[in-house]
From Swiss-Prot:
Purpose: Catalyzes the conversion of 3-deoxy-D-arabino-heptulosonate 7-phosphate (DAHP) to dehydroquinate (DHQ).
High-level lineage: Bacteria, Pseudomonadati, Pseudomonadota, Gammaproteobacteria, Cellvibrionales
InterPro entries tied to this protein: Dehydroquinate_synthase (IPR050071), DHQ_synth_AroB (IPR016037), DHQ_synth_fam (IPR030963), DHQS/DOIS_N (IPR030960), DHQS_C (IPR056179)
Residues binding NAD(+), per UniProt: 70-75, 104-108, 128-129, 141, 150
Species in which this protein is naturally found: Teredinibacter turnerae (strain ATCC 39867 / T7901)
NAD keyword on record: yes
Biological process, per Gene Ontology: amino acid biosynthetic process; aromatic amino acid family biosynthetic process; chorismate biosynthetic process
Cofactor(s) it depends on: Co(2+); Zn(2+); NAD(+)
Pfam families assigned: DHQ_synthase, DHQS_C
UniProt entry keywords in alphabetical sequence: Amino-acid biosynthesis, Aromatic amino acid biosynthesis, Cobalt, Cytoplasm, Lyase, Metal-binding, NAD, Nucleotide-binding, Zinc
Name the record gives this protein: 3-dehydroquinate synthase
């Protein structure tokens, strides 16, 4: 087992990475506020791992669970209320601990419920998708979507621990594996050229779910994210580089309807647009751009926007992105591989031409 630490002073917490961790009570017990626990999961994960986690937590005096519908389209205030309804009906108090057993949607919603219930209770992240293991479970971003924009309602609220059992990836659908690899690739592009080069060599091993390759990719990804979040917990500065491709990607998700493209697919196509814009601006060498696009494609991710999405649709959704400052669009772009910047200082004409060139059908 590997253990990382996200250093946030009093809000610091461990990130455990290894196999069969769901069966280890010692990883959970120190992080429970009391013997009250509510496990939040979804209809896909519950048949696979809920009983296993409940057995691990069988020493708890009060152990309840709630099973949410699966999918980004259910990341809403209405479904969030299901968690609150269960907490209240089962008389959980402010000493309870919520455990998020699932992917990014479950983790984001459980964290937001924990931030809100009785003005804040503890929670633990147990991510079951590659994307949530390397990204959404670490860093304290929680929330739900709004019809006009992704993650528009939420809070920064840190977990007590993140327990990453790599063995659960054995049951992950191939599409979700590729989606998670989008976030893994992102870390190499924005901050770590040796890791990017390692990914170029080891993508076949990752797609084949070789355990050592996956564990290494997860550890490096979490270490990069932990390092960035430790410097900028509330995303007022450098943390925004973790959103490479996300402004374009969130626009795709909002336009298509949540759930049509999974998040990692939208981020993959978004990173291609971000790299191509960086190249057209003269900030990223064309060969480096080609390498990034090739790696994204090798992971089985889309490299083009969805057919029928217009440049105007992109601009309309990007205008409400959370990085917009004083009415100005800011993007995460590349000044070379391994060097991401957050900037609004780019030629908008170049962006508009890129979207015209890439938006087809």
């Amino acid at each position: 087992m590997r253990t990382l630490n996200l250093d946030l002073g009093e809000r610091s917490y461990p990130i455990f990475i290894g196999q069969s961790l769901l069966q280890n009570p010692a990883l959970f017990t120190p992080h429970l506020s009391s013997q009250q626990v509510l496990v939040v999961t979804n209809t896909t994960v519950a048949p696979l791992y809920l009983a296993q986690l409940k057995a691990t937590l069988s020493h708890c005096d009060k152990l309840d669970s709630v099973v949410l519908p699966d999918g980004e389209q259910h990341k809403t205030l209405g479904v969030l209320n299901t968690i609150f309804d269960t907490l209240i009906a089962q008389r959980h108090n402010r000493k309870t601990t919520l455990i998020a057993l699932g992917g990014g949607v479950v983790g984001d919603m459980t964290g937001f419920a924990a931030a809100c219930y009785q003005r804040g209770v503890n929670f633990i992240q147990v991510p079951t998708t590659l994307l949530s293991q390397v990204d959404s479970s670490v860093g304290g971003k929680t929330g739900v979507n709004h019809p006009q924009g992704k993650n528009m309602i939420g809070a920064f609220y840190q977990p007590q621990a993140v327990v990453i059992d790599t063995q659960v990836l054995d049951t992950l659908p191939e599409r979700e594996l590729s989606a998670g690899l989008a976030e893994v690739i992102k870390y190499g592009i924005i901050a770590d050229i040796p890791f990017f080069e390692w990914l170029e060599t080891n993508m076949p091993a990752l797609l084949a779910r070789e355990s050592e390759a996956l564990a290494y990719a997860i550890e490096v990804s979490c270490a990069i994210k932990a390092r960035v979040v430790a410097q900028d917990e509330k995303e007022s500065g450098i943390r925004a580089i973790l959103n490479l491709g996300h402004t374009f990607g969130h626009a795709i998700e909002s336009h298509q309807g949540y759930g049509d493209w999974v998040h990692g697919e939208a981020v993959g196509a978004g990173m291609v647009l971000a790299c191509e814009l960086s190249s057209r601006l003269g900030w990223l060498d064309a060969k480096e751009c080609d390498r990034a696009v090739a790696l994204i494609a090798a992971a089985g991710l889309p490299t083009e926007p969805p057919s029928g999405m217009s440049p105007d649709a992109f601009m309309r959704y990007m205008a409400i992105d959370k990085k917009v400052l004083d009415g100005g669009l800011r993007l995460v772009l590349q000044r070379g591989l391994g060097n991401a910047v957050v900037t609004g200082d780019f030629d908008a004409v170049v962006l508009q031409q890129l979207l015209r060139d890439r938006c087809i059908g």
